Amino acid sequence: MSNVRVSNGSPSLERMDARQAEHPKPSACRNLFGPVNHEELTRDLEKHCRDMEEASQRKWNFDFQNHNPLEGRYQWQEVDKGSLPEFYYRPPRPPKGACKVPAQESQDVSGSRQAVPSIGSQAYSEDRHLVEQMPDPTDSPAGLAEQCPGMRKRPAADDSSSQNKRANRTEENVSDGSLNAGSVEQTPKKPGLRRHQT
């Protein structure tokens, strides 16, 4: 390293170290519009939410906070749940991470079949006025995670069936006389291309 030359145009290492210590480089995350006034931001957000709520009340003549109809151009009336289309009261789909256990039957290792209740058959709904039964605590997404920590899309295969893919055999391997009792697959070959010499 003693043979390394430092050009006059570049600062020496000692000067660079001193400069970094004196004036630390400002962070890349900069506030372009000045410091944030959190009180003003909160007031603006609350005002915006109130304005949106009032606009919705005027548009639909319904008090969404108190769940009461208001006087206006719409006539709100209570209807029976049975007269509504099913998608209005159908329980929501379980979350993507929830276990999907078939409701009919499952088969254990010995081959005997058992009836298994379907997990997630009850509703996961926060709209309690639409759902008559409250979900079981074990049916919650947290309970499902405990019951099915690592559900796989496919069950793990036995060691004997792990090699169920057939080998891709070529013509040379077939002519060796090492044929299996099963069928032989051959890879199709492209027709030979003429090479032009230049």
From Swiss-Prot:
GO terms for cellular component: endosome; nucleus. Residues 1-34, 85-198 are annotated as: Disordered. Residues 51-91 are annotated as: Interaction with CDK2. The modification Phosphothreonine is found at T170, T187, T198. One of its GO terms (molecular function) is protein-folding chaperone binding. The modification Phosphotyrosine is found at Y74, Y88, Y89. This is Cyclin-dependent kinase inhibitor 1B. It comes from Cricetulus griseus (Chinese hamster). The gene is CDKN1B.
